[in-house]
Amino acid sequence: MDIRPARISDLTGMQNCNLHNLPENYQLKYYLYHAISWPMLSYVATDPKGRVVGYVLAKMEEEPKDGIPHGHITSVSVMRSYRHLGLAKRLMVQSQRAMVEVYGAKYMSLHVRKSNRAAIHLYRDTLQFDVQGIESKYYADGEDAYAMHKDFSTLKFDTPETNDELAKTVQSLALNN
């Protein structure tokens, strides 16, 4: 397994991952806009054959209302057969690191469906995001969203597990299936 910055050639794979997993879908030009505008913020997880199995699509807020430079997670998704391997966490951490190191971001924001317990657990319990409020009827189907925020002032990056360790885990899962 490899985690790396997204390339233009990855965009259709990212879109495919999104279409398989999430109700919020985007046109290819939206992925392209992110890739061109903030090339160091979006990352992909690829399998040994180079196929995109997960991604994080991220951006910097262009005109922040509070005047503070900060990033925003537009979308994150991992294909079902590759979940519970820590890929979403690794993708998010890579994007956070780039927001801080490349753009000087002070915090990151995102929205999550109130019904998405797995994502809320990842953001709140694993990645230490705080719920800032509820945005009523945020999604097209009328569901509310939690507006979440992660302050980078005390950010410390864990050393991610090596690609070799993750590859061994994936290989063992493949052998057991």
Curated annotation (Swiss-Prot):
Specify whether Thylakoid is a keyword of the entry.
Answer: no
- Keyword field: Acyltransferase, Cytoplasm, Nucleus, Transferase
Write down any Gene Ontology CC term: NatA complex
Question: Where does the protein end up?
Answer: Cytoplasm; Nucleus
Family named by the database record: Belongs to the acetyltransferase family. ARD1 subfamily.
As for what it does, the entry says: Catalytic component of the NatA N-terminal acetyltransferase, which catalyzes acetylation of proteins beginning with Met-Ser, Met-Gly and Met-Ala. N-acetylation plays a role in normal eukaryotic translation and processing, protect against proteolytic degradation and protein turnover.
Which residues are in the N-acetyltransferase domain? 1-153
Assembly mode: Component of the N-terminal acetyltransferase A (NatA) complex, which is composed of at least ard1 and nat1.
Can the keyword Aminoacyl-tRNA synthetase be found in this entry's annotation? no
> Pfam families recorded for this chain?
Acetyltransf_1
List, in alphabetical order, the Gene Ontology terms for molecular function in this entry: protein N-terminal-serine acetyltransferase activity; protein-N-terminal-alanine acetyltransferase activity; protein-N-terminal-glutamate acetyltransferase activity
Q: What are the annotated disulfide bridges? A: none
PANTHER family cross-referenced by the UniProt entry: N-TERMINAL ACETYLTRANSFERASE, N-TERMINAL AMINO-ACID N(ALPHA)-ACETYLTRANSFERASE NATA
Superkingdom per UniProt: Eukaryota
Which reaction(s) are listed as its catalytic activity? Answer: N-terminal glycyl-[protein] + acetyl-CoA = N-terminal N(alpha)-acetylglycyl-[protein] + CoA + H(+); N-terminal L-alanyl-[protein] + acetyl-CoA = N-terminal N(alpha)-acetyl-L-alanyl-[protein] + CoA + H(+); N-terminal L-seryl-[protein] + acetyl-CoA = N-terminal N(alpha)-acetyl-L-seryl-[protein] + CoA + H(+); N-terminal L-valyl-[protein] + acetyl-CoA = N-terminal N(alpha)-acetyl-L-valyl-[protein] + CoA + H(+)
Q: What is its EC number?
A: 2.3.1.255
Q: What is this protein called?
A: N-terminal acetyltransferase A complex catalytic subunit ard1
